[in-house]
Amino acid sequence: MRLCDTHIEEYLDAGKIVITPRPPKSAISGVSVDIRLGNEFRVFSEHTTPYIDLSGPKEEVSSALDKVMSEPIIIAKNESFFLHPGELALAVTYENVTLPDDIVGWLDGRSSLARLGLMVHVTAHRIDPGWSGKIVLEFYNSGKIPLALRPEMTIAALNFEVLSAPAARPYNKRVDAKYQVQQGAVASRINQDN
């Protein structure tokens, strides 16, 4: 069952879903909560790496990732991060989100931003039961003009579904939970896959 606005507010009041800072009522609509953009970004830096063998030896994958990803870029609240056409950037939500073992979250981009060519999450829009932390966004500008992104602008909507039962292996109890409690624009940790 997908939660409606009334139930989202009840779950927030009860502490079953935790979003910090707590969104105002105006950010909660029919079936979703507006989520804002944080101030940390990462991009692909200039490099000479010809490719990354995603199924290669973990040490080689790790080394390649270190070469291609920038250090975190922190943007002041009144400044903009410019995402140019054809560029991918990682960013992070302003809010921390914590879900219980029986709720899955779904992150959706905003239609108004998509109409300008901004993809807010390239593919990863599921927020697992047991998740806690800031959500990393995978931005891609598929449009034809640069887009100025500002910290704390509304960037996406998060909605929630109640599972048929609590998950037996929620994210916070998995040994391989490589992004649990992330607070920044964490780069890919594919080298930690089993």
From Swiss-Prot:
One MF annotation (Gene Ontology) recorded for this entry: dCTP deaminase activity
| Keyword Phosphoprotein (UniProt) | no
- Matching CDD domains: trimeric_dUTPase
Q: Which UniProt keywords apply?
A: Hydrolase, Nucleotide metabolism, Nucleotide-binding
Q: Which NCBIfam families has this protein been placed in?
A: dCTP_deam (TIGR02274)
Q: Say which family it is in.
A: Belongs to the dCTP deaminase family.
Q: What is the name of this protein?
A: dCTP deaminase
Q: Which organism is it from?
A: Psychromonas ingrahamii (strain DSM 17664 / CCUG 51855 / 37)
